[in-house]
Amino acid sequence: MAPLVRRSWSLRGHTPVLRQRGRALQKVSAIAAICIPPKRDQVALYFRLHADANVNTERAMDFLGHLQHQLHTPIVLVWDSFQAHKGELINECVLPRSAHLEYLPPYAPELNPVEYLWAYLKTNPLANDPAFDLHTLTHRARCATRSVQHRQDLLRGFLQHTGLSLRLA
């Protein structure tokens, strides 16, 4: 749970100290989707956090089921080449329900708008904010991500920064 330090301050001659917990490696894993509806009038962010767990194929499938339930429509899914996204369960269970599945090229995070979301969260609202327990870290990550859900300018910026032609309104 080591925080990203962007800026520090201390009196001249005194080294700044940022306290952090160093005994256990705890983390919050996340999965997210930035959705563009057919009307292209609003951009939506859906996410799930998993405290002290990895995002595996089962969790990715659960997230996709939740996403399809929320959207009430077949989706075109564009995913990175993360191994949990390429499991046979995904192809068997998700493809029949969704319209189309495409993968981004491997090692191309600059084409993935969700990567820009994570970078923004780590370097802005969550920077310089150490969490001393897993509950606090999860709460701060959830609050920071929810704050982005209502920022159309940021969500559109993440999409436009990829350079993909998405025809946003």
Where are these regions (language model features)?
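Extended, low-complexity cationic-aromatic segments
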Residues: 1-62, 166
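RNase H-like polynucleotidyl transferase catalytic core
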Residues: 14-22, 97-113, 129
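Short beta-strand segments
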Residues: 33, 76-80, 102-105, 138, ...
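Acidic, metal-coordinating catalytic cores used for nucleic-acid/nucleotide bond scission
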Residues: 53-55, 77-91, 106-111
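Short, basic/hydrophobic alpha-helical segments
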Residues: 57-76
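C-terminal anion-handling pockets and recognition modules
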Residues: 113-169
